[in-house]
């Protein structure tokens, strides 16, 4: 997911942080990722786009708090908030390619991470603890219909415009990126 490195490198650059601070932030993100991997999923084919961009945003939010000198509790709160905002996002790639609306959803996840980090740093209470949000993320992913989990069978994937794009892409094999 591009949300994690995009948000972290952009924030580190903006704050003019040394590389060591970025590495520490990546470790914080990784710890959140361990919790997600252990109790939910990162695969859009299993949990929709919230499993990919949502997880990336949740990990990035915690890392940004670390970069800005926040507390452990604030990092966890930021991750919880970001994941709460991502629940239920489906995976419906246009033209059966992981390009659109994927890029926009990665941008959304990165901006969500920055916003949630700032909320947590302002001591906004996340209300639902991170572990319960991750459990909910798993449950919601299980409830998302299979047509909305990177199958090219639902959502934007089946619009008339998307089908025209898919047909055009199939006319020139090998020219475009691989499909899901």
What are these regions (language model features)?
Residues 1-88:
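Phosphate/pyrophosphate-binding betaalpha-module
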Residues 57, 62-180:
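Functionally critical mobile loop/hinge segments
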């Amino acid at each position: 997911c591009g949300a994690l490195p995009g948000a972290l490198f952009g924030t580190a650059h903006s704050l003019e942080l040394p590389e060591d601070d970025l590495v520490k932030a990546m470790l914080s993100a990784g710890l959140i990722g361990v919790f997600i991997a252990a109790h939910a999923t990162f695969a859009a084919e299993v949990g929709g786009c919230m499993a990919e961009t949502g997880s990336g945003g949740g990990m990035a939010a915690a890392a940004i708090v670390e970069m800005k000198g926040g507390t452990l509790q604030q990092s966890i709160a930021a991750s919880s908030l970001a994941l709460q905002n991502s629940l239920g996002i489906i995976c419906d790639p246009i033209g059966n390619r992981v390009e659109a609306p994927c890029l926009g959803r990665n941008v959304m996840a990165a901006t969500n991470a920055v916003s949630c980090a700032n909320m947590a740093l302002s001591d906004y209470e996340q209300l639902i603890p991170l572990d319960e949000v991750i459990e909910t993320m798993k449950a919601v992913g299980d409830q998302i219909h299979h047509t909305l989990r990177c199958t090219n069978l639902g959502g934007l994937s089946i619009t008339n415009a998307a089908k025209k794009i898919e047909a055009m892409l199939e006319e020139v094999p090998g020219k475009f990126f691989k499909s899901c």
